[in-house]
Amino acid sequence: NAVRALKEKGYAPIIYHELEARQLPPEFIYLALQESNYDERTIGPPTRYGRAKGMWQFIAATGSQYGLKIGPLKDTEQYDPVDERHHPLKSTIAAAKYLKYIYKTDAQASGLLVMASYNWGEGNVINRIRSMPLNPEDRNFWKLIASYEIPQETYDYVLYIFSAAVIGQNPKLFGFNFDNPLQGLDDTG
């Protein structure tokens, strides 16, 4: 179970701390669940942008932009211990920086738009947001999907993370046998 591995590997406090340090929602911890099941050795399929690698599934260009050293096996299907996209702490710091950047764009009105931007690319989402009414109430994920066609992958991505965040609040209520992975990580316990 990925959530159990999150706790056992000690990643929950690392991710929580980096999100909290940047005043980001702690529920963004579930992005790494959707990206890789919290597996730092994950390697994505080849794309026109290269291969995404690591727990946060950075392509080389984005990883480098956010301070990660990219290894010589960047576009191969091989794990590369030199590639910091595979490093749990360093890639989490980079992911938190990237999410903070997205949060400062036009996507800031909605955490769901930030998630869509992380998956589909902030340019794709922001270009559509900018053509929407200026009223913040009209600039949200639900209006985006009602007004524009977005990739099914992005739609599913956002809803899976949203669902994981809801379930994560009280997993036993939904029939899962694990505790809230965020429980006890904040000062209120």
Tell where the protein language model's regions lie, with residue ranges:
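Extracytoplasmic and endomembrane cell-envelope/extracellular-matrix remodeling and assembly machinery
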Residues: 1-11, 21-22, 65, 71-93, ...
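Solvent-exposed coil/turn segments that connect beta secondary-structure elements
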Residues: 34-37, 61-63, 166
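Extracellular/periplasmic catalytic domains that process cell-envelope and extracellular macromolecules
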Residues: 23-25, 48-51, 152
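Short, functionally critical alpha-helical segments immediately adjacent to catalytic or ligand/cofactor-binding
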Residues: 24-41, 114-119, 162
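Short amphipathic alpha-helical segments at helix boundaries and their inter-helical linkers
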Residues: 36-54, 129-130
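Active-site acidic/histidine clusters and adjacent loop/turn architecture
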Residues: 15
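Short, surface-exposed glycine/acidic/tryptophan-bearing loops
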Residues: 45-69
